UniProtKB/Swiss-Prot annotation:
This is F420-non-reducing hydrogenase vhc subunit A. Pfam families: NiFeSe_Hases. Induction: By selenium deprivation. Ni(2+) binds at C61, C64, C445, C448.
Length: 474
């Protein structure tokens, strides 16, 4: 048996690889996407006070840390049965939209654009950020500028640009001042214009894939899942909606009920869990997808006017639901524009500087369980905590976006290999890159996703030491 591997998969957050196995006759036997790191945050959180969760979970990732911060904060609010003030909710939503801008601008400008600009190039020295900069430096500058706006908002509202700290039980630890708002309004003055310009550049790049017969890389039909708020796309709050491969609504439920609809499993070749819809099995049946394209597939409309115009154009061109992985890029840019519009809307609302940002919390009012849900840049994110009557965590389940897309990435690389790589001899660099293109379209965050140990019984021991002495073993 012959094996080929792509290791590491580049331009993704975290560490992964793809292996291709060929039988003794040289024919393709199987293809798998492996994630080769383990984090274990679900175990780390056991024994911690529940109010500490929003501080610990952002450390899962340095890119989508705001999403983890807010999902945990929402869950903690539910553990204490508290409803946060309107302004606190607005501030949380603001930094979530800002983080979305940061992440989407980073992914398109730095990670995805080489695939879209040089999809058939064998030369890896050209198929990278420097190659893109040589062709369109203005696009790179725009991506950096948008990312700066997003990160600055997170820093001002969240206390830190990386790993924010202000979302606490009952609301926010501090309000936004008038001076800070004025500064952010000035900083974001051209944000919507820049996002729309980037969308038009990216839209053309994605559409050019049709000419190279690459639009259907990794294509398969599946269910799609995402949050909707009265039918509109919403990355901060709402119900979870699931549509089938034909676009029919199968389920719409409160995030707290997720365990009634989603099942989790493991496979021996990856540290990522594999998720599927309960009572649905098989390729394109049990498998479902999340992330930007899925959010467009499940919603009825966008929440902002300019993004709505592009959403309508997208649906008219590609139909609904659209299943092509390459369209995640296009959808990501529509969402980048929507988040930019919402940032301006929040900052222009005088309620954003109200000082009533924290509700009174009764420390004895512990319900023992809480679920928090947001749409992270990469898809639906659920934090589920259970506690004892003292508020100490005794069980944690993190349903992370990339985990939910894991079956899709596995199927996607298999589809590419079946079409382009019949034998090892034809595995040219740009052909192998086509498999990476499918993975990167989902913008996976592998650090976020790895929190399970494989299928066979294994023991991972973590030794916590202080002053050279062992104080705890996990």
């Amino acid at each position: 048996m012959t094996k080929l591997s792509i290791e590491p998969v580049t331009r993704v957050e975290g560490h992964g690889k793809v292996t291709l196995s060929f039988d003794d006759s040289g024919k393709l036997d199987k293809v798998n996407f492996h994630v080769v790191e383990v984090r274990g945050f679900e175990k780390f959180l056991e024994g911690r006070y529940i109010e500490d969760a929003p501080i610990f979970t952002p450390r899962i990732c340095g890119i989508c840390q705001v999403s983890h911060h807010l999902a945990s904060a929402k869950a903690v609010d539910n553990v204490f049965g508290v409803k946060i003030p309107e302004t606190a909710n607005m501030l949380r939503n603001l930094i979530h939209q800002a983080s979305n801008v940061h992440s989407h601008a980073l992914h398109f400008g730095m990670l995805a654009s080489p695939d879209l600009m040089f999809p058939t190039t064998d030369d890896a020295l050209k198929r990278n950020l420097l190659g893109v900069a040589g062709e369109n430096m203005d696009m790179i500058k725009d991506s950096i500028a948008m990312r700066k706006v997003g990160q600055t908002i997170v820093q001002k509202v969240g206390g830190r640009a990386i790993h924010p700290v202000t979302a606490i039980v009952g609301g926010q630890s501090k309000p936004l001042t008038e001076e800070e708002r004025d500064e952010l309004l000035t900083l974001s003055d051209n944000l919507v214009e820049t996002a729309e310009r980037t969308l038009n550049v990216g839209k053309e790049m994605v559409e050019n894939l049709k000419e190279k017969d690459l639009m259907n890389l990794g294509y398969f039909e599946s269910y799609h899942m995402g949050l909707v708020n009265n039918g509109a796309q919403d990355i901060y709050e709402g119900n979870i909606r699931v549509v089938n491969s034909e676009g029919k609504i199968e389920y719409e439920f409160d995030p707290a009920e997720y365990a009634n609809y989603i099942t989790e499993g493991v496979r021996p070749y990856s540290y990522l869990k594999f998720l599927a819809l309960l009572k649905r099995r098989g390729e394109g049946k049990g498998a479902y997808r999340v992330n930007t394209l899925s959010r467009l597939n499940v919603c009825d409309k966008m929440p902002t006017p300019i993004a709505q115009k592009y959403y309508e154009e997208f649906v008219k061109t590609y139909g609904k639901p659209a299943h092509q992985p390459m369209l995640f890029h296009y959808a990501r840019l529509i969402e980048l524009l929507s988040s930019s519009e919402l940032i301006r809307k929040f900052l222009e609302d005088d309620k954003i500087v109200d000082t009533d940002v924290r509700a009174e919390v009764d420390p004895k009012n512990i319900t023992g369980e809480g679920v928090g849900c947001v749409e992270a840049p990469r898809g639906t994110l659920i934090h589920h905590f259970k506690t004892d009557d003292r508020g100490i965590i005794n069980d944690t389940n993190l349903v992370v976006a990339t985990v939910q897309n894991n079956p899709a990435m596995d199927i996607g690389v298999q589809k590419v290999a079946e079409k382009y790589i019949k034998t090892p001899e034809v595995a040219k660099p740009h052909i192998l890159n086509h498999m990476e293109m499918v993975i990167r379209a989902y913008d996976p965050c592998l650090s976020c996703a790895t929190h399970t140990i494989g299928e066979e019984p294994k023991i991972l021991s973590i030794h916590v030491c202080q002053g050279g002495k062992l104080i705890k073993t996990l």
